[in-house]
């Protein structure tokens, strides 16, 4: 189990409160699909994913990105119990969707990049460290069913 200090929790929740989940979620998933094109195979039903502009403008990518980032809100509310929080999603992604758990780590890293671009100077090394710890812990929780 990952332990978050009070300072880390404050850094995470402070930034989360300013986050536009719809915008950042679509951007994060879109960037994942552009930078790591092999991840597109999990989104065959999303329509046109033929170019970066098609991906970033795709309404299904934006909608699913919002859904994904909304689940990070659950992580923030349950930082001390991520394994239980993501048990059902882990099972879904493992048993039904067969998603490589490495993709969770990649998405987390993309999210950290999105945060850095959106928050600039406010995204200090300390804030980055807290968020990196969270996205890593979420990736581990999502990959739990695979073990």
UniProtKB/Swiss-Prot annotation:
Domain Globin per the UniProt entry, residue ranges: 3-147
UniProt cross-references to SUPFAM superfamilies, sorted A to Z: Globin-like
Pfam families assigned to the protein according to its UniProt record, in alphabetical order: Globin
Gene3D superfamilies: Globins (1.10.490.10)
Superkingdom field: Eukaryota
Swiss-Prot/TrEMBL GO biological process terms: hydrogen peroxide catabolic process
Sequence positions that bind heme b: 64, 93
Gene Ontology MF: a single term: oxygen binding
Keywords of this entry: Heme, Iron, Metal-binding, Oxygen transport, Phosphoprotein, Transport
Tissue: Red blood cells.
Entry keyword Signal: no
Modification sites for Phosphoserine: 14, 51
Any one GO cellular component localisation term in the record: haptoglobin-hemoglobin complex
Role summary: The epsilon chain is a beta-type chain of early mammalian embryonic hemoglobin.
Subunit and partners: Heterotetramer of two alpha chains and two epsilon chains in early embryonic hemoglobin Gower-2; two zeta chains and two epsilon chains in early embryonic hemoglobin Gower-1.
Family to which this protein belongs: Belongs to the globin family.
Protein name: Hemoglobin subunit epsilon
Gene (UniProt): HBE1
